[in-house]
Structure formats: C-alpha cells, structure tokens
Design a protein with these regions (language model features):
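Short loop/turn segments at secondary-structure transitions that flank enzyme active sites
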Residues: 122, 133-135, 167, 225-229, ...
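Solvent-exposed loop and edge beta-strand segments that line ligand/cofactor-binding
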Residues: 104, 202-211, 268-285, 323-337, ...
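Aromatic-rich carbohydrate-recognition surfaces in CAZymes
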Residues: 120, 139-145, 152-154, 159, ...
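A short secondary-structure junction motif
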Residues: 261-265, 309-316, 340, 371, ...
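Terminal accessory carbohydrate-recognition/targeting modules of carbohydrate-active enzymes
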Residues: 1-249, 276, 283, 294, ...
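Residue-level signal for inorganic ion chemistry
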Residues: 116, 288, 475
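Catalytic cores of carbohydrate-active enzymes
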Residues: 252, 319-320, 369, 373-381, ...
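Conserved oxyanion/phosphate-binding beta-strand-loop segments in alpha/beta enzyme cores
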Residues: 241-275, 304, 308, 506-516, ...
C-alpha cells in the first residue's frame, strides 16, 4: 500500500468552507469532512462515505473507517493502489479480480463534487455509497440522538435532508438511484483529537444508500448545503471538473495555495488565518497582505479588505479577530492595529491614497498616544506601554486555564518596532525620533548584544525581561525602517542564530531558559503551555 496513509489533504471552497481528510480515507480530526460549509458559522454536514463495490466474484470495500477502541473496518486501504492530491484528491483502487476504480473529488463554491469511474476490468460493477452526516459545528462532535431528522426529500436519484433546525440543509445530487434506509454508525475514533486529550468519539447518521452501475457509466455525486434536489449531477460534475482543471492548469501550486486564504465570508472579502480551525484574525490578515495580495498585483483587493477592517476601529484599536457565529468582536491585540497601519501605507503606495484608510490610521495612532484599552498608551519616553494581568495582547497569546503563559506586560520589543514604524509612516517624525532614541538606549542587552524582550516589565521602571526570543528581529528587519544598524544589528542576528535558529525555523524561546519546553505534544493544556516557550515557528 502507498506510504503516508495519514497524509492530509484540504480543498477550500472559496467561501471559508472546505473539504479535508487523509490519504487513507478515514478521518483523524473532527475537522475532516467532505462538505464543511461557512454559513456565518462553519458547519460539518457530510463527514464522509461508506462505499463498496459489487463485482462478479465478490464485494470489496472502497472506504476505510476507524472505530474505538482500535478497530479499522472496512479496509478499503487494502485495495488502495495510489493517492494523489494534485490537481485534486484522487484515489486509485485495485481489486483482486482485476477491477480498478478511480475516485476523485473537487471543491467549488457550489459544493463538493465526487466522481468514480472504472478504469480496468469488465463485467458487472455496482457501486454503493452511504453518506455519513452530522450537521454540527465544526468545533463539536455528535452522538446518536433522537433529534436528528432523517426525513428525505427525493427526486430521481437526488435527495436532501434538514438534520436539525437552524443548521444548513444537505442535498446530494447523483447519477444513480437512492434508497432511503436510515441508520446510525457509532463510535468513530479521531486519533488527532485523542492525542490532544479532547473528545474523540463520534456517531454519524446515514440516511440511505446511493447505487450506481459502473459497468454502464461513471458515477457522480454533488454535495451541497441547500434543500434543492433539482439539477443534473452528470452535467454539474463535468462542468465543475472541467472548469477547475482549466483554472488549476493556469495557476502554479503556490498561487493556488495563496488563493485558498482569500475568501468571501458573507458580504465580506477577507483573509483567513489558517486551516482548519482559524477564522479571520487582524494580525494575520495585515501581515499576509504583502505576500498574498501586494506581491501578486492585487492591491485593489488589499485596499478593499483593509477598508472593511477600518470600519471596526474602536478607541484606536482594531479587532484581534472576528469570532465564529458573529459573536462580539475581540480587541485584545496591541500589535494588530500597528500592523494595519503598515499594511495600509504599503497598500496606498501601490493602489493610491484612500481617505478611509488614512482616517483609520490617524484614529489608531491618536488612540494609542492618548491611551486606550488594556493599558495601551504612549509613555513619557515615547515608547508604547501595554498590558494588564490576565490579558494576552501580543502574538504570544496562549492561555492555560485562564493563565496567560507569556503575559509580556510592559514594553514588548516588537511592539516598539511596529509603533515607531507606524509613527514614521504617518509622518509623525518627532514622536518616532523620540521613541527611537529611547529604544536604542533601553533595549540593548550589553552583556549579550541581543535585545531585551520587554523593558519596564510589569510596568515597573527599569525592570527587564531578558528572555531570548525571535521578537527582537523586527527591530532590525521585516519592517520599512530598522531601529538598529551596523554592529548592533549584527549582534542581534548572531544571538538569534546562536540560540534560536533550527533547520525548521526559529525557536520561540532559547533552550537555556528555565521556562523552555522542548516538546510540543500531549493534551491541549500541555500544547498551549509550550506554544511560545520553545516551539519552532
């Protein structure tokens, strides 16, 4: 069998939803699904399939499931000849009687399109597919319950269901026939959730079976988040595969990957921070502007996204993130607004001036200078102070049982680099010069040549946090203006290379530090505790 059975694939739909899974076909995460839609909140609708094929000699499984405690059944992986993820996921199965079947799927804004075709063999070949449904939040798991509604609306070989009130409906258009035969599949095991110490067992509902005659023609199913049972699956599938084949052939893999993070979330165009569980975060959005948009000639879209964010300036701050389900905006980030200022100026340099962006920049800098939430204020030395107990404000934002692991209260080093750059870009040269002088006088660790991670730690004058972290690099690069030059800048690089550099990236904390965590594993609390205490980023 192929190597890397638990290698993961992910196909975005362009609206913030996606399909994802493993090469083996079984799910290892709660986020693995064939139809996961973004309806303001992300819902898992179709988790997977149970699939098998009847040929003249026998019946063979084409799917693989993993159940608690450690049961793998059926074992479609025993017949899996190959898996490829490019240009889209495709599995090739080779059966003992000489039959070979290819199964592929492609995801579009209209849903997930699945296809099966016999590529070798002769004689009868009947394919059966049982969809496994949940209709749950993508952060949750489902257990068997009486509230799940198996009622089906059927037309020809198409069917739809409304699993729960308030959850998107599910429709499957097919080129086969549908037999309504409700059942529950119990105790699926998700090993990635288990490794994190989280709930890892799920029951799934299967409303019926779709059947296809592969000896006569290829099979297709179109999975959608709606009630509509009208439509021809064959033509829709052919159109989707044809359109995506043409689009993907024009775009290099890196371009397609970049586009995966640019989504239409309702009426908003935005950038999401990552898959599978992140939504749109301010800090990540503004940092990503350069690579995802400006470097690719999409300054107009960058301006559109930034102007949308500008509508949410409050007391000189932008939200840290937009929560799932449209909850209250979270403003606990000191650096996000400063990254916005830098992204706005870089965007306007290409796309032209924007009164809306300029207004937002002034509101942010005025708010920070005069003082806003969480103790954020310009101090007498011109540097930016921030923080209060129990609140995480920088990118090192892990919390365990309500405790902030890296509070960094005071004047964090990268925040000063962002603050000074924002002031200089906005033409506030006097404030920028004063803060730069204070930075050079106060942040250099004379003993090592590196920079302190925080000065005036815990808002105590003169107290420093000398932890060696990668945050200091922003003072010498990555931003429009460097705060140090020459030997001082080289000393920072040497310190980072000596203590933090690995073949995979930079450690978040030097191994010599008593708080260093050498491994990122275990349960959620253990992982969050190690997130910024040594983990390589």
């Amino acid at each position: 069998v192929i190597d890397g059975l638990e290698r993961e694939w992910l196909e975005p739909d362009g609206d913030g939803g996606f399909a994802s899974g493993t090469a083996a076909g079984y799910r290892t995460r709660r986020y693995h699904a064939l139809l996961l839609t973004n309806a303001g909140e992300r819902f898992v609708l179709v988790n997977g399939f149970e699939a098998w094929i009847d040929v003249a000699s026998s019946t063979f499984p084409l799917s693989t499931q993993r159940y608690a405690p450690r049961v793998v059944h059926p074992r479609g992986i025993d017949h899996l000849l190959a898996f490829t993820a490019d240009p889209w996921p495709c599995w090739t199965f080779s059966l003992p009687d000489g039959t070979a079947v290819a199964h592929e799927l492609v995801v579009t804004t209209q849903g997930t399109v699945c296809a099966w075709r016999r590529i070798a063999g002769a004689g009868p070949a009947s394919l059966h597919v049982r969809p496994l449904l949940s209709g749950r939040s993508y952060h949750a798991l489902m257990r068997e319950n009486g509230a799940f509604d198996f009622t089906a609306t059927m037309q020809d070989g198409n069917a739809s269901w409304q699993p729960y009130r308030g959850v998107p409906a599910i429709s499957i258009l097919s080129t086969g026939t549908y037999e309504h035969a409700p059942d529950w599949y119990r105790n699926f095991l998700y090993t990635e959730e288990e490794a994190r110490g989280l709930d890892c067992i799920e029951d799934l509902a299967s409303p019926g079976v779709f059947t296809f005659d592969l000896a006569q023609r290829d099979a297709a199913m179109v999975l959608r988040a709606d009630r509509d049972v009208a439509g021809d699956a064959r033509s829709l599938a052919a159109e989707a595969f044809g359109r995506e084949r043409k689009r993907r052939s024009r775009l290099p893999t890196g371009e397609r990957a970049a586009d995966a993070f640019i989504v239409q979330a309702g009426a908003r165009r935005t950038i999401i921070a990552g898959y599978p569980w992140f939504t749109d975060w301010g800090r990540d959005t503004f940092i990503a502007m350069r690579g995802l948009l400006l470097a690719r000639g999409r300054a107009d879209l960058a301006s559109l996204i930034l102007e949308d964010w500008a509508n949410h300036v409050s007391r000189g701050m932008l939200p840290n993130r937009f929560p799932d389900g449209g909850g209250a905006l979270e403003y606990n980030a000191v650096d996000a607004s400063l990254w916005f200022v830098i992204a706005a100026h870089e965007t306007m340099a290409v796309a032209g001036s924007s009164a809306r962006l300029a207004q937002a920049v002034d509101a942010i800098l005025d708010g920070y200078a005069s003082g806003t939430r969480y103790g954020i204020r310009m101090d007498d030395d011109g540097l930016l102070a921030c923080g209060e107990p129990g609140v995480q404000l920088t990118w090192m934002d892990a919390r365990v049982n309500g405790r902030v692991i890296t509070p960094r209260i005071g004047k964090p080093v990268e925040v000063q680099a962002l603050w000074i750059n924002a002031l200089r870009l906005a033409g506030r040269a006097a404030d920028a010069d004063r803060a730069t002088s204070a930075f050079r006088a106060r942040f250099v660790n004379g003993a090592s040549g590196s920079l302190y991670d925080v000065v005036d730690a815990d808002h105590v004058d003169g107290r420093v946090d000398a932890s060696v972290r990668p945050n200091q690099l922003f003072a010498i690069g990555g931003l429009p203006s460097s705060l140090l030059e020459g030997d001082q800048a080289c000393a920072v690089v040497r310190a980072v290379e000596s203590d933090l550099l690995t073949p995979a990236g930079l450690r978040s904390l030097a191994p010599s530090d008593p708080a260093y965590c050498p491994r990122y594993d275990g349960g959620l609390a253990q992982r969050d505790g190690a997130d910024h205490q040594g983990t390589v980023w």
